[in-house]
Amino acid sequence: MISTEEIESFLHGNDPEEFIVAIEFDYASNSIYKIKEIPGKGKEIRKDTFIPFAWVGDLRNLNFYGNSKEAQKAAMTKYGIMIEKLETHGNERLEKGLTFMVKSLKGYRELIQFFRDGNLDPWGEKGKDKIMILPPVEQYLISKEKRLFKGFENYDEVTRLVFDLETTSLEPKDGRIFMIGIKTNKGYHRVIECIDEDQEKGAIIEFFNVINELKPSIIGGYNSANFDWHWIFERCRLLGIDPKKICKSLHPQHSFTRKDGMLKLANEVETYVQTSIWGYNVIDIIHSVRRAQAINSSIKSAGLKYITKFIN
């Protein structure tokens, strides 16, 4: 039985390092970057490393490396693989589960390739119940026992920026942005207005300039994943703006990415497009509201006006 003290220790992390607000992983160099917001000093980026790992079950019936021990040993040498048998303490359920930890001293991609060379895709049909490989950032936090936002008295100490667009239509192809509102929890408040497309170009560029100047740890909006960010990047395309030139991240070689995401709510799944900017936490506040709705039937709507009244 796990004690309350052990649970608390895990939740808060045993590593004492404070003020980490974001973690980024570089696949090319197998490097971890810790982004810290030091009170009174601002942003600081520090590089770190970790040993990637996978939890693995019994693979003997899956023809792994053709059941050849010699082939597997050669691959282990090639990819710097170490295998450790986990303690199960005679628990039958654990004995039938993921009882091995497989580590690669050469990197995260090498760990994945070790399994693929053995004709076993960790996320394929054969491997999905036998191999669990967490994303590298989660692995780093677990293995180094670090936690985000540790050391802050409360979240007001973390710089947060929220923004909202006003547009002339529902779709970017049919209208334009005529106002961008920006506010932080540190007293910054600005409204950027634009009356034509030339001013709209300048407004979008200025929006990213503000982010680069203030360097908030959290960038939030309401329904921003599928609306505000969609509008910004689509209007960039229509206006001939290269967003990679104006969207400056905290790393000179990384900018932003946009990829499909899923919000799981009990038996429902909602899709959205996640915007990620290196070094920042980009969030859509409506996702938190939708999760709260899933467990609190008194929240009747996710509309912004309703939620504002509900929490006040």
What are these regions (language model features)?
Residues M1-N312:
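The two-metal-ion catalytic cores of nucleic-acid processing enzymes
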